[in-house]
Amino acid sequence: MDIRDEILKLKKEKGAIILAHYYQIPEIQEIADYVGDSYYLSKIAKDCEENIIVFCGVKFMAESAKILSPEKTVILPVMEAGCVMADMATEEGLAKLKEEHPNAKVVCYINSSTEVKALSDVCCTSSNAENIINNLEEKEIIFLPDRNLGSYIQEKTPDKKFILWNGFCIVHEAIQKEEILRLKSEHEGILTVAHPECSKEIRDISDFIGSTSEIINFVNNSSNKKFIIITEEGVLHQLRKNGEEKEFYIPYGKMVCRNMKMTTLKDLYESLLKMENKIEIDEDLRLKAYNSLKNMHKLGG
């Protein structure tokens, strides 16, 4: 029997649901019940009826699912699949910032550890950050860990004062302006579409900025035929499915998050078969972190 059939058989037997982020390999996206960005998947994990969630993504995503649904079994097929940016934010550093800015609200990107979420007032994703910041009464915002998303939201909410953590996504940060200008010069009429995790100099020369789901929606609804896609190349799988006649260009021909690409069909099969790699979170810590995620769903729309 084909491994895909084995996975579907196991999923049915165990009553599990498979969630996959847009940055996963195409084979994982194809077998998942739901494919989406962090915010969409967190809502599915919170509201789904299934008691077993297999989260094909990175650790902070699976942890967020467990924080929101402690009664459910949450499995991360590859426990080593972490997030470099999430690891840049520390509890100690955040605690110090909170002391220095006692009146500030702490907004953490969902790409954060459970410990950082526990010290934050509200979580956000790239698709709901602006909404959340606008819904906060406080004028002073500690934003972490992504300085690029933070500066982007700061531009959108000029009445707020931001204290930005100096973190970044190594995949988006690596893109240079010269490469984008080169692609633009080679392809007349091409549209540049970027994720807000990109630096300001990249955002400033882009035609559209949005989360992964917003990028996909923009491209799908555009009559344009050529696009520079400045985010992890996993989104190309969905874009090509929906727009076969369209051309897509990735800077340097490659934008890969190694952690997102770790999970294979074999890993997914093994984790379901053996019910291994379960996410466990101390209950006191979970309750503290739950607050920030609960507030995200309340304020994020």
Curated annotation (Swiss-Prot):
Q: Which reaction does it catalyse?
A: iminosuccinate + dihydroxyacetone phosphate = quinolinate + phosphate + 2 H2O + H(+)
Query: What biological function has been recorded for the protein in this entry?
Result: Catalyzes the condensation of iminoaspartate with dihydroxyacetone phosphate to form quinolinate.
| Gene3D superfamilies assigned | NadA-like
Keywords noted in UniProt: 4Fe-4S, Cytoplasm, Iron, Iron-sulfur, Metal-binding, Pyridine nucleotide biosynthesis, Transferase
Residue positions annotated to bind iminosuccinate are: 21, 38, 109-111, 126, 195-197, 212
**Pathway note:** Cofactor biosynthesis; NAD(+) biosynthesis; quinolinate from iminoaspartate: step 1/1
Provide the residue positions that the database annotates as binding [4Fe-4S] cluster: 83, 169, 257
Q: Which family does it belong to?
A: Belongs to the quinolinate synthase family. Type 2 subfamily.
What Pfam families would the database entry show?
A: NadA
Free-text comment on the cofactor: Binds 1 [4Fe-4S] cluster per subunit.
Protein name (database record): Quinolinate synthase
Q: Which NCBIfam families has this protein been placed in?
A: nadA, PRK09375.1-2
Signal peptide interval: none
Q: Which organism is it from?
A: Clostridium perfringens (strain 13 / Type A)
Q: Does the keyword Transferase apply?
A: yes
| UniProt cross-references to InterPro entries, sorted A to Z | NadA, NadA_sf, Quinolinate_synth_type2
Keyword DNA repair in the entry? The reply is no
Source organism superkingdom? Bacteria
Q: Where in the cell is it found?
A: Cytoplasm
What GO cellular component term, any one, is given?
Answer: cytosol
